[in-house]
Structure formats: structure tokens, C-alpha cells
Amino acid sequence: MYNILICDDEPDIVSALKIYLASDGYGIYEAYNGREAIEMMQKTEIHLVLMDIMMPEMDGIQTMVKIRENSNVPVIFLTAKSEDNDKV
């Protein structure tokens, strides 16, 4: 089974993604900010991270940089940002 970490500060988004992905048989882990995501990755084998860019404490970019220090797990950003200057 593949484990997916969903990291978003909006509980409704985490819940919606969790319901959708868990129904396909993925192991789902939740984090509500960057620090929680990093802690979860230290304790659990994660195969994919779905992460919001705008979060309190550590934003998605800062969190990804920290994740990259120890892991090459794929990170997919989810965001409401839509302007050209917001592109990563």
C-alpha cells in the first residue's frame, strides 16, 4: 500500500482528499502545518505528499525544502493561488 501525506491548514480540504484517496486503498496521513508534516515524515514511510503552499508556521515551500534534506518523495502542491507570479 502506498502512503500519502496530506498537508493543509484547512480541515475540510484534508477531509475531502482523505475520503477520495482512502476509497482507492491508499494509506492516508494528515498534517495541518509544515512542522507536523516534517514530524510525520520522520515517523512514517510516505510515498507522496499533497501540500498546500499557504500555511501558518512553515509554508509549503519552506516545508518542501526541509523535506528535501532527507527525502526525495514526490511533492504535489495544492493552492488557491492563480496568478503568473505565484508559479513555483
Regions found by a protein language model. Name each.
Residues E30-L48:
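Acidic, metal-coordinating helix/loop segments flanking the phosphotransfer/catalytic sites
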